[in-house]
């Protein structure tokens, strides 16, 4: 418990004055128990202005089968999940167990041909106020520039390319952008899905479209079609 509390106290004291911090996390994929609850209680006592989440709380060590088995263990303010399916999110948000808002602290793993199902997730998010957002894992491929290849293209090393052992092969290459921050196709898809102005075809033959404004404080009159 002392080690967990020490890390959380340092985390809060370091970042408490940063306005971009809207929520405290108790860690990542590190089990759950009374030590976690102790960290949650300390954090809420130190800073009562922000929510607290921990993905490990509702799982109770991963033991659950369906929406009717959701139990809120401990004192997390939100139902925080990783990689729950879009139908699962919809079912929770519409169930009698949805006593706390839901958040996907990880979803749509951007590895290989990913991320996928972005539109399906955001259809659920936009239609359910108690599902307040989701975070793609992850932003950037973890590799380093190793000069240019013979064809002139940049060469990036990862997963044992430098002879390091052990390694995780290509599991670190799972970002929305490349190491030099060039967008992958997944980032372009995500941008289209979460764009604040939506245009949908109603009747193409008649030239009818539905325009939806998802901005909170901006009118569409400032834009040109």
Residue ranges and their predicted role:
Residues 1-210, 215-221:
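Extended substrate-binding grooves/exosites of carbohydrate-active enzymes
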């Amino acid at each position: 418990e002392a080690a967990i509390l020490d890390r959380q106290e340092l985390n809060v004291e370091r970042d408490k004055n940063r306005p971009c911090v809207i929520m405290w996390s108790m860690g990542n994929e590190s089990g759950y128990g009374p030590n976690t609850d102790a960290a949650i209680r300390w954090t809420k006592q130190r800073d009562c202005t922000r929510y607290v989440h921990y993905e490990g709380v509702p799982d109770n060590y991963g033991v659950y089968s369906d929406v009717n088995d959701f139990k809120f263990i401990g004192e997390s303010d939100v139902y925080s999940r990783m990689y729950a399916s879009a139908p699962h999110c919809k079912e929770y948000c519409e169930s009698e167990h949805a006593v706390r808002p839901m958040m996907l602290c990880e979803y749509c793993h951007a590895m290989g041909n990913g991320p996928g199902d972005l539109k399906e997730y955001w259809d659920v998010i936009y239609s359910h106020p108690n599902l307040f957002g989701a975070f793609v894992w992850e932003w950037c491929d973890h590799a380093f520039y190793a000069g240019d290849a013979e064809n002139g293209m940049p060469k990036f090393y990862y997963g044992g390319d430098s002879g390091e052992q052990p390694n995780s092969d290509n599991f670190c290459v799972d970002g929305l952008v490349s190491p030099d921050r060039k967008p992958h196709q997944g980032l372009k898809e995500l941008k289209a899905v979460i764009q604040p102005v939506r245009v949908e075809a109603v009747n193409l033959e008649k030239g009818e479209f539905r325009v939806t404004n998802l901005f909170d404080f901006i009118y569409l009159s400032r834009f040109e079609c």
